[in-house]
Amino acid sequence: MKKIEVVAAIIHDDEGRIFATQRGYGDYKDGWEFPGGKMEPGETPEEALKREIWEELETKIVVERLVQTVEYDYPQLANGRACSRSEDSKHTLVSSHLTAAFHLKMHCFLCSIESGSLVLKEHEAAKWLSKDQLDSVDWLPADKVVVEKLK
């Protein structure tokens, strides 16, 4: 099974809102996620996250702390998205009862904006969401695990 390791930014503002982005490409187009991307060889998760957010949003961030590492087996899209999960303190393993297309390991960090204006270069939409609004968008499965922890 293909394994992908990524980083994701849970960007918050002074009002406690969280920045969510809508994917503009790929198999999971239109799903909502925390912005971020794949780590390159030799990068720390924090370095990768700063690079990805600059590339995707033209924004410099401060990486504050690791919130959670999620491991998720994404099923073949034709089979749907049924899954079960088990949790411990900082790791969540979500395993599908279906054939997995790939295994995702996503390191999610709480971040704030240092400078920049959040220009959407790869996403089709974005929203600032209060905690009460977190369920108002259709989160991708791995991101949904993190959303539950943030509530």
Where are these regions (language model features)?
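Residue-level preference for beta-strand/loop junctions
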Residues: K3, Y28, H103-K105
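Conserved N-terminal beta-strand and adjoining loop/helix that marks the start
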Residues: M1-I18, K38
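NUDIX/MutT-family hydrolases
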Residues: L110, L118-L150
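Active-site-adjacent beta-strand/loop module that shapes the phosphate/pyrophosphate-binding cleft
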Residues: D13, K60, E71-G80, S84, ...
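Intrinsically disordered, low-complexity, charged terminal extensions of DNA damage-control enzymes
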Residues: E58-K60, E64-V67, H103, H123, ...
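Hydrophobic packing within well-folded, soluble alpha/beta domains
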Residues: I11, P45-I53, L66, A126
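Intrinsically disordered, low-complexity segments enriched in serine/threonine/proline/glycine
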Residues: R85-K90
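Conserved Nudix-box catalytic region and its N-terminal flanking loop in Nudix hydrolases
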Residues: R17-E55, T59
